[in-house]
Amino acid sequence: MSADPTVPQLLVPLAEIGDRGIYFEDSFTSWADHIGHGAAIAAALRERLDPTRPPHVGVLLQNTPFFSAMLAAAGMSGIIPVGLNPVRRGAALARDIEHADCQMVLADTASASTLDGIEHVNVDSAEWAEVIDAHRNSEISFQNAAPADLFMLIYTSGTSGDPKAVKCSHSKVAIAGVTMTQRFGLGRDDVCYVSMPLFHSNAVLVGWAVAVACQGSMALRRKFSASQFLSDVRRYGATYANYVGKPLSYVLATPERPDDADNPLRAVYGNEGVPGDSERFGCRFGCVVQDGFGSTEGGVAIARTPDTPAGSLGPLPENIEILDPETGQQCPVGAVGELVNTAGPGRFEGYYNDEAASAQRMSGGVYHSGDLAYRDAAGYAYFAGRLGDWMRVDGENLGTAPIERVLLRYPDAIEVAVYAIPDPVVGDQVMAAMVLTPGAKFDVDKFRAFLAGQSDLGPKQWPSYVRICSALPRTETFKVLKRQLAADGVDCGDPVWPIRDQS
C-alpha cells in the first residue's frame, strides 16, 4: 500500500471476507455481504443523483449497518456522504443540508423526526428495501480515488456558532485507520466497538476506519450507553474501542464490580477525556487507554506520552506553538495563547462552501486552531479553552479550562462548565455551572473556603456566580453547549449563588 492510502484500497480486501464483519444487536453480516450492500446503495443513489451537481447525500442515521454500508458505498463510488447532526432541527438542519449542497437526505425512522417536514428517504421503509433488493446484484467495483479526493463532509459541533462542513479526504480517513491499527497491533482477530456517532469525525476516523483497516470485525451500537458498555464488550468480544469527550467518565460512574477487568478489551483511543480518567479506566478494565488532542479539522494534534503530567495534553510537537493572538509572538511559560501549527495546515483540508472561514483558519500561512493553551517549563501543554471562551476579567485575559480543572476538585462536584457573562461595567464575569454528586447540597461558605485553599486559582479566576444544574447541556458528542449557558446568564430556572464579592 502506498504511503498515502485511500478508502477504496482498504475496502477491496473486505469483499472476499466471509468469516468477519459487522455485529449489530443480534445480527452478524460478513464483510463480503456488507460490501455487496454498499454496492447496491451506490447503484441506487447514482440513479437518483443529478450528475451535473456535486454527488452529496445527507446522512441522518444512528449507528446502524446501513450507515457503515453507506460509507462503504462512498468509498466504492465517489458519492460524498454529509454527516448531519440530529441535535440540529428545523431551519438549522435545513441550513446544513443546503450549505453542503445535498441532493437528497437519507434518514432512519429513529432520526427522521428531527427533519420537521424536510424531504428525505426513510431507509427503514419497505419502499427503500425494494429499491435495494432491485440492486442486490450490482457489480462490486471500486473507484480509482486519489488520496486528496474528497471522501466525506463532517460538520463541526457548532458549540460557538453555525457548524462548518470540514472536508475529509480519502487519505485523511484511511491514514487514521491504518495508524491506529499499527499503533495497537490490531488485526483479523480483533473486534472494534463503535458507539460514538458516525456523523462525527472521531467515530469515522478512529472507529470505522480502524475496523476497515485491520480487517477484523466491528460491533456497532446505535447510541452510546454507559450501562451497556461492558456487557457489549463481552458479548461481541470487543478488543478496541474509541470515544470522544465524557464516555470514560460515564462508564466509570457505573457500579464497580470485582470482575470488571475480566473482559477482552485491550486498547481504547479517544480525545477530550477528563484528566485522570484514562488511568482509572485502564486500571479498572485492564486495558491501555490513550487520550489524544485534536479536532475534526486535523490541523493540530498532540499525543500524551508516558511521562506526561496529570492534566496535560502532552509535549508540544515540533512546529506546534502557543502564540499570543494579538501580537503573534510566542507566549512565555504559563501564559495562555492560541495553539498554532506554524508549519502549515497539517491535516486541515478546508471548509466546504466557506472560503472566508478557511482563509481565516490559515491566516498568515499558519494554521490557527482556535484552541487556547499554556505550557510549563518542561514544554508540556495544558488546554485553556477556546478563543470564544476567552474571558476579559478586570483587564486580564483568562481561559476557562484551567478554572474548570480546579473546580472539579471540589468534593461535591462531578461536572463543571466555566463561561463568561457580561460584567455590568466592562468586560466579563466568570460564571460556573456545576452538577453535584447525588444528594449533595450546595454550601456557599464551604465552596468559598475551598476556593481560598486552591493555590493555583487566582482571585480573578473565582466565579462571580455558580449555577447548580441537574445536567449540563451537551451535543451528541458530549461537548458542553456553553453558548446556551451563557445566554441563560444568572436569570435561569436553576439555583444561582453569588460567590465573588461584587463590591
UniProtKB/Swiss-Prot annotation:
- Name the domain of life: Bacteria
UniProt EC number = 6.2.1.2, 6.2.1.3
Q: What class of enzyme is it?
A: ligase
State a single Pfam family of this protein: AMP-binding_C
One Gene Ontology term of the molecular function aspect:
long-chain fatty acid-CoA ligase activity
Cited CDD domains: FACL_DitJ_like
GO biological process terms, semicolon-separated: fatty acid biosynthetic process; long-chain fatty acid import into cell
Q: Which reaction does it catalyse?
A: a medium-chain fatty acid + ATP + CoA = a medium-chain fatty acyl-CoA + AMP + diphosphate; a long-chain fatty acid + ATP + CoA = a long-chain fatty acyl-CoA + AMP + diphosphate
Cite the PROSITE patterns for this sequence.
AMP_BINDING
Pull one GO CC term from this UniProt entry: plasma membrane
Keywords, sorted A to Z: ATP-binding, Fatty acid metabolism, Ligase, Lipid metabolism, Nucleotide-binding
Q: In which pathway does it act?
A: Lipid metabolism; fatty acid biosynthesis
Is the keyword Phosphoprotein assigned to this protein?
A: no
InterPro entries reported in the protein's UniProt record: AMP-bd_C, AMP-bd_C_sf, AMP-binding_CS, AMP-dep_synth/lig_dom, ANL_N_sf
What NCBIfam families does this protein map onto? PRK07867.1
What exactly does this protein do?
Catalyzes the activation of medium/long-chain fatty acids as acyl-coenzyme A (acyl-CoA), which are then transferred to the multifunctional polyketide synthase (PKS) type III for further chain extension.
To which protein family does this belong? Belongs to the ATP-dependent AMP-binding enzyme family.
Q: What is this protein called?
A: Medium/long-chain-fatty-acid--CoA ligase FadD17
Which species is the source of this protein? Mycobacterium marinum (strain ATCC BAA-535 / M)
